[in-house]
Amino acid sequence: MPGVKLTTQAYCKMVLHGAKYPHCAVNGLLVAERQRPRKEHPPGAGSHTLFVDCIPLFHGTLALTPMLEVALTLIDSWCKDNSYVIAGYYQANERVKDASPNQVAEKVASRIAEGFGDAALIMVDNAKFTMDCAAPTIHVYEQHENRWRCRDPHHDYCEDWPEAQRISASLLDSRSYETLVDFDNHLDDIRSDWTNPEINKAVLHLC
């Protein structure tokens, strides 16, 4: 499997989702730019998947529900309109010391892998979470022989960790998580935009 990297925007929105609902499990999707055919890649191009954005899905009880199907369909359509592809899944469990993927996480990630062969499953480690974001809080899993296995936990999976650390800490300090919209919020009020343009602008402003 190629390497995996997250942009600052993707990492920050994952962190903010967990911060908004600290006593709940949360999950979401990670999107990458749609890949060109392999023959179009320039010689020597690095082989890795770059998650450019994060789409927060649900908080509370995470299950394989009709609403998940609705979310996947809508987000897949949005991705096609913007030359993206659903390429990963993230989840933070309810219990602080539980950072292992459960059946829901593995099933959703496996479904994504059917459409994107290099899909990744990212588990957020709540035990590592601090307001100053001193260390990355993620574990990256890859699918190998139909099983999800944890990749090197010491590897840096952020495109620019110092930037991601600084901006996520700044957004937490300003309580930006209060304005984050996940798909649950969108279902409660369809005017709520799950692409989170305001947070995207805040990240860009801080870069």
Swiss-Prot record:
UniProt KW Nucleus keyword: no
Signal sequence range: none
Recorded GO MF terms: membrane insertase activity
One GO CC term, this protein: cytoplasm
InterPro entries referenced in this protein's UniProt entry, alphabetically: EMC8/9 (IPR005366), MPN (IPR037518)
PROSITE patterns: MPN
Keywords for the protein's UniProt record, in alphabetical order: Endoplasmic reticulum, Membrane
Membrane topology: Peripheral membrane protein
Compartments, as annotated in UniProt: Endoplasmic reticulum membrane
Start and end residues of each MPN domain: 4-147
Any Pfam family hit: UPF0172
GO biological process, one term: tail-anchored membrane protein insertion into ER membrane
Biological function: Part of the endoplasmic reticulum membrane protein complex (EMC) that enables the energy-independent insertion into endoplasmic reticulum membranes of newly synthesized membrane proteins. Preferentially accommodates proteins with transmembrane domains that are weakly hydrophobic or contain destabilizing features such as charged and aromatic residues. Involved in the cotranslational insertion of multi-pass membrane proteins in which stop-transfer membrane-anchor sequences become ER membrane spanning helices.
Entry similarity comment: Belongs to the EMC8/EMC9 family.
Assembly mode: Component of the ER membrane protein complex (EMC). EMC8 and EMC9 are mutually exclusive subunits of the EMC complex.
Name of this protein: ER membrane protein complex subunit 8
